[in-house]
């Protein structure tokens, strides 16, 4: 039989969990409420893309099967909290989901909120799977190899984009326009481009096309034109900043898994070196400014874990961060000279979220409905958006201040508990660094709403909380 012994059954569960993670990174890089907005290389121009409902139900079924198999392997009591995990922290996510359900009852858009609540529920399932199941399994790290393979696939796709893939995509769209297969006029009504113009740099490239083709390209939605002519990489993710978030979340643990104890040390070290080089290059090519800054913070935090004298660790960390900031200043000097438009746009989103939370402080407008609230507060000429680009403030807008406080208390509480632990296992240290990056990026992005980012983050968070404790200050360690 496939799994006759307890050890074999554990392996089946871990492999199934790894398959779930790999599939999430392969197929579910879009926000749950933006499933019809794809990168140009995969969009069917002229119409909305086919629904992902069946695939989504399939991946949820795999997650459900993993839960049944995983919890069946546990001895009673099955919901016994691991040592060192406060009860209030363990059950805060359940309270947060409960509040989302209350908000759902009065939502302004049932379809958006239903998709969001189902996604949030799947995140909680992943968290408790890590907390109660992975935390008790000796071979738990095996499941993370699926996430590592998914990261490698995204990086391979991004590398192809860098070396001709993006240009080929652009040329294919232009060929469709010239052949008549694509009529830009059918897309223009969807663009919502009032007050927006094509950037000067892109306009120069369009002007180099034949006059008739150039005129038709200008009729395309401006957002699509920007994507066509962008040099930023996104792999299989929704957009470049999401790829940066994926790299920051999973590259540290992937390297730790490869370099860790085991056979074939030299080949694994060589693969790790190549993965690090490609990962950092793709992070740079993604053009994510927040990603660069978070990477600097992670590098400084990693230096603090080195087994060297404290003064040397601090010196290395400070030097690395100063060099990184200097590089950032040089790289993006022109961006800030032009007014840092994306930063200004985000402040507009955040202002609208706070205004909505003030208007509906108890239950908000409903999970995942910021797009509707933003339309009421959007300044003339401001960029449209469907998400707040801040996971924390979106809770306030969508589910009121109680939803915000529950989510912020959970993420902040988990950070506080994990910061007090001294970790010796390189894989656990890498997981903590990746989760730190995910939590920080949540202040400027929407990783909570992207399954490929949220699922591995919640799973690893539960597993890390359940990991063996080694407290900095044992006098205050919980009983």
Model-derived regions: residue spans:
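Alpha-helical transmembrane segments of multi-pass inner-membrane proteins
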Residues: 2-31, 55-73, 86-105, 110, ...
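Juxtamembrane membrane-water interface segments that cap and precede transmembrane helices
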Residues: 33-51, 221-236, 344, 348, ...
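Short, charged juxtamembrane terminal tails flanking transmembrane helices
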Residues: 2-3, 473-479
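Cytoplasmic membrane-interface regions of multi-pass membrane proteins
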Residues: 71-81
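Extracytoplasmic loop-helix module adjacent to an early transmembrane segment
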Residues: 176-178, 215-219, 341-360
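Glycine- and aromatic-enriched periplasmic loops at the membrane-periplasm interface
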Residues: 201-210, 348-353, 363-379, 391-395
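Interfacial loop-to-helix junctions that mark the boundaries of transmembrane helices
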Residues: 38-57, 82-86, 113
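A short secondary-structure junction motif
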Residues: 104-105, 360, 377, 381
């Amino acid at each position: 039989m496939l799994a006759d012994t307890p050890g074999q059954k554990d392996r089946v569960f871990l492999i199934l969990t790894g398959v779930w993670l790999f599939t999430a990174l392969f197929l579910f890089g879009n926000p749950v409420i933006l499933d019809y907005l794809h990168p140009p290389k995969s969009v069917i121009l002229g119409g909305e893309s086919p629904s992902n409902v069946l695939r989504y139900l399939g991946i949820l079924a795999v997650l459900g099967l993993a839960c049944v198999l995983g919890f069946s392997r546990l001895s009673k009591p099955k919901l016994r909290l691991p040592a060192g995990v406060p009860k209030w922290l363990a059950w805060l996510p359940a309270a947060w989901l409960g509040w989302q359900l209350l908000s759902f009852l009065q939502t302004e858009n049932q379809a958006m909120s239903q998709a969001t609540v189902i996604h949030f529920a799947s995140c909680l399932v992943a968290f408790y799977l890590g907390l109660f199941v992975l935390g008790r399994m000796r071979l738990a790290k095996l499941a993370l190899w699926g996430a590592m393979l998914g990261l490698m696939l995204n990086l391979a796709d991004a590398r192809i984009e860098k070396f001709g893939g993006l240009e080929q995509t652009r040329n294919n769209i232009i060929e469709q326009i010239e052949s008549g297969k694509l009529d830009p006029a059918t897309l223009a009504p969807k663009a919502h481009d009032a007050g927006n113009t094509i950037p000067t740099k892109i306009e120069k490239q369009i002007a180099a096309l034949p006059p008739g083709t150039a005129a038709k390209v200008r009729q395309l939605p401006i957002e699509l034109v920007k994507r066509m002519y962008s040099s930023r990489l996104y792999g299989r993710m929704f957009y470049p900043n999401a790829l940066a978030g994926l790299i920051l979340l999973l590259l540290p643990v992937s390297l730790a898994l490869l370099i860790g104890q085991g056979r074939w040390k030299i080949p694994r070290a060589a693969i790790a070196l190549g993965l690090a080089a490609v990962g950092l290059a793709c992070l740079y090519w993604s053009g994510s400014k927040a990603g660069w800054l978070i990477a600097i913070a992670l590098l400084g935090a990693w230096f603090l874990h080195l087994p060297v004298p404290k003064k040397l660790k601090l010196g290395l960390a400070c030097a690395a961060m100063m060099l990184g900031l200097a590089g950032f200043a040089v790289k993006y000097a022109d961006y800030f000279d032009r007014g840092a438009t994306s930063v200004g746009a985000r402040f507009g989103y955040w202002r609208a979220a706070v205004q909505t939370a003030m208007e509906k402080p108890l239950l908000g407008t409903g999970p995942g409905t910021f797009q509707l609230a933003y339309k009421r507060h959007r300044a003339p000429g401001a960029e449209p958006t469907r998400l707040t680009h801040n996971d924390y403030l979106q809770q306030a807008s969508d589910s009121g201040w109680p939803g915000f406080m529950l989510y912020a208390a959970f993420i902040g509480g988990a950070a506080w508990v994990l910061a007090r632990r001294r970790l010796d296992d390189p894989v656990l240290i890498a997981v903590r660094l990746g989760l730190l990056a995910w939590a920080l990026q949540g202040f400027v992005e929407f990783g909570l709403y992207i399954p490929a980012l949220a699922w591995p983050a919640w799973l690893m968070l539960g597993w890390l909380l359940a990991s063996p404790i080694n407290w900095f200050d044992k006098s205050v360690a919980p009983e």
